[in-house]
């Protein structure tokens, strides 16, 4: 198992007496692609800035390779940062932009040339050394910003919503490129985003944050398929969340009937919440379904139809490849492996 390169221990941060981070604890492994995911104001960027040395924690420790670095300035940390605003120098060539940090460190010129060429190859911009920044597209400028950060050979790269300014097509392409770069280089990437698709596409581990606290951490599959609470379930993709009762291990009561499930470990007859993803509800003939409802709306989304099906006083969001006309009475089946049980937390 890979060892930790960074440990965040009980990090608390407040601004003007208002808590922004509430005793965050997080271990980040070597060569891991970790994403801090959450809505605006959740504390993800503050966490990143504390790691980079741009903000001080009010309390707590940041450990890098076994040593506390709270008082180490940014330029002495083996950590580099790429921001959404690329901060490239328009009066310099691409070569000069990438080489800027190496020149400051007085690295020998032959080494600078070798390292810059290696970075240009990595970001698929070989032969661009003498071009101006203004001649590049947004996606190419972002690649240069990444190359400039990586040429210093950091052990950790911090990325603060670096793809936010790109259009959808470029963003999708850069997601694949970033993951490829990270694997080739074998260094740790810590990525901040509010975009669930980005997090699910690129990450080895996702840390979901809200209101200065970690709500859940795990693999993309764990986060999507086994959300820990209603916030995570709603934030990571669309969800149907309903109240229910866990009758016993592998048996749950919701929507007026009993369903087999794969969860266990709850108290008998414990109040719980059930999560069912829209794509996990199967539309069938009304006399063949576990539940029955009326199609209230239907929208074609390209790869599926998105429907609202009203069952008694409850509305279900359903994604199906089968078209059902509005007003049609349909059956709905939900299989045990598609029912996810969460502890019920009072508001």
Swiss-Prot record:
Provide the alphabetized UniProt keywords.
Answer: ATP-binding, Cell membrane, Membrane, Nucleotide-binding, Translocase, Transport
Q: Where in the cell is it found?
A: Cell membrane
Top class in the EC scheme: translocase
* Record has tRNA-binding as a keyword: no
Q: Which SUPFAM superfamilies match?
A: MOP-like, P-loop containing nucleoside triphosphate hydrolases
Q: Where is the ABC transporter domain?
A: 6-236
CDD domains according to UniProt? ABC_PotA_N
Any idea of its EC number?
7.6.2.11
Keyword Transcription regulation assigned: no
Ligand binding (ATP): 38-45
Q: Name one GO cellular component term.
A: ATP-binding cassette (ABC) transporter complex
Q: Which reaction does it catalyse?
A: ATP + H2O + polyamine-[polyamine-binding protein]Side 1 = ADP + phosphate + polyamineSide 2 + [polyamine-binding protein]Side 1
Q: Which GO molecular function annotation, any one, does this entry have?
A: ATP binding
Q: How does it sit in the membrane?
A: Peripheral membrane protein
User: Whom does it interact with, and what assembly results?
Assistant: The complex is composed of two ATP-binding proteins (PotA), two transmembrane proteins (PotB and PotC) and a solute-binding protein (PotD).
What is the role of the protein in this entry?
Answer: Part of the ABC transporter complex PotABCD involved in spermidine/putrescine import. Responsible for energy coupling to the transport system.
> What PANTHER family would the database entry show?
SPERMIDINE/PUTRESCINE IMPORT ATP-BINDING PROTEIN POTA, SPERMIDINE_PUTRESCINE IMPORT ATP-BINDING PROTEIN POTA
The UniProt family comment states: Belongs to the ABC transporter superfamily. Spermidine/putrescine importer (TC 3.A.1.11.1) family.
Protein name according to UniProt: Spermidine/putrescine import ATP-binding protein PotA
Q: Which organism is it from?
A: Clostridium novyi (strain NT)
């Amino acid at each position: 198992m890979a060892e930790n390169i960074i440990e965040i221990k009980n990090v608390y941060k407040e601004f003007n007496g208002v808590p922004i981070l509430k005793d965050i604890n997080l271990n980040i492994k070597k060569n891991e692609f970790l994403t801090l995911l959450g809505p605006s104001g959740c504390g993800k960027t503050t966490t990143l800035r504390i790691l980079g040395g741009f903000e001080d924690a009010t309390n707590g420790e940041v450990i890098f390779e076994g040593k506390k670095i709270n008082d180490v300035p940014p330029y002495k940390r083996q950590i580099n940062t790429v921001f959404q605003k690329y901060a490239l120098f328009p009066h310099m060539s691409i070569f000069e932009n990438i080489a800027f940090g190496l020149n400051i460190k007085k690295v020998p010129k032959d080494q600078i040339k070798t390292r810059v060429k290696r970075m240009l190859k990595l970001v698929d911009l070989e032969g661009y050394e003498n071009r101006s920044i203004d001649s590049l597209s947004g996606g190419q400028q972002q690649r240069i910003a990444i190359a400039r950060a990586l040429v210093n050979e950091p052990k950790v790269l911090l990325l603060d919503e670096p793809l936010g300014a790109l259009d959808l097509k470029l963003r999708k392409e850069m997601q694949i490129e970033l993951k490829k770069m990270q694997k080739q280089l074998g260094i740790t990437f810590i990525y901040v985003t509010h975009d669930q698709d980005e997090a699910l596409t690129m990450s080895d581990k996702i840390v979901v944050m809200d209101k200065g606290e970690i709500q859940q951490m795990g693999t993309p599959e764990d986060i999507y398929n086994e959300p820990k609470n209603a916030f995570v379930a709603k934030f990571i993709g669309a969800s149907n969340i309903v109240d229910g009762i866990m009758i016993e291990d592998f048996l749950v009561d919701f929507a007026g009937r009993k369903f087999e499930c794969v969860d266990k470990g709850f108290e008998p007859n414990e109040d719980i919440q059930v999560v069912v993803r829209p794509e996990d509800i199967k539309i069938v003939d009304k006399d063949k379904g576990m539940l029955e409802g009326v199609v209230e709306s239907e929208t074609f989304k390209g790869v599926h139809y998105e429907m609202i099906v009203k069952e008694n006083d409850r509305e279900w969001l359903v994604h199906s490849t089968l078209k059902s006309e509005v007003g049609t009475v349909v059956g709905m089946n939900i299989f045990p492996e598609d029912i996810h049980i969460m502890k019920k937390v009072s508001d």
